[in-house]
Each structure stands twice: as structure tokens, then as C-alpha cells.
Amino acid sequence: MCIRDSSNNKPHRLLEHGVIKADAALCQKLGLTAENPYVYKIVRCVDVSSEVDEVDYSYVPLSVCKDHTFDCEALKTFFLHDYICRYFNEKPTHIRIFVDTPLTSDMELSLLNAPPEKLFSWDTFLYHGNQVLAVTTTVSMPKENRPFITLEF
């Protein structure tokens, strides 16, 4: 099943969204060409105890979302995977997560109040077959004894 109950999700604060021209590193991540480097960028953060805990930079190629009008309220509630499942025709078939990934030139990290070398990042790629539907780079300040992934059975 694609859609999960999002009531337990940490609410996101939507900071920015709109079309941008992807830099070379982002084009490479998404498999975009120099002739069509445009993506829809969504920047959200999660606050814990009035401090920014993580910042999510999500990018959806315009070839995937060209006729879609993004629902800002839903972007605050749903994980991007669930949003794409609900609103897009192409449904994700799998994800891949890479840790300690390079950051792109459009990322503003001052919200995290930490030097870049202290930050931890990971990329979550959403695929439909071999097609990249979206990528989210999450940047966070590591904290001791904090669970990174919880798997439920």
C-alpha cells in the first residue's frame, strides 16, 4: 500500500517551493540533461523544541510534475513519498537511501546553527522502475543516542 497514515509524522514547516535550474551536481543525481535542467524544489524543516532539527531539500524533475499544482498544506503533512503516491500518476516502486552525501549549491544551511563539517546528510531517491521521480536530501545535526531508522514489523 502506498499511502500511510500520516498523523504520526513530524509536521514539516514549508520554507520554500518553486521551479529552479538544477546545478551540475543535482542534474547528475536526477539524471537530467543540460538541455532540461529544471526541477520543482521544496524546502521544509522539522522543528523540535523550537529549534530546527533537520532541513529537507526535495527536488522533483519537471518532466515528472509538469502539470501538477503542489498542495502546500499537504506538503506540510506528508512525506514526499506519500505525497507523490497520492497526487502523481507514476507511483514509486522503490527507494534508495545514501548516507553522508554531497550537498548542492542551492542549500542554505544556516538554520541548523552548525558548521557544515558537523552536519549529517542523506539522500532518499524515489524511483518508478529506473526513472527517478524525486530526491530528498536531508541535512541534520547529529545527536547522541538518537535513532536514525526505526523499522516496524
Give the residues covered by each predicted segment:
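Conserved small/polar residues in nucleotide/adenosyl-binding loops
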Residues: 1-5
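Amphipathic alpha-helical segments that line or abut small-molecule/effector binding pockets
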Residues: 8
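C-terminal all-alpha effector/ligand-binding and dimerization domain
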Residues: 11-153
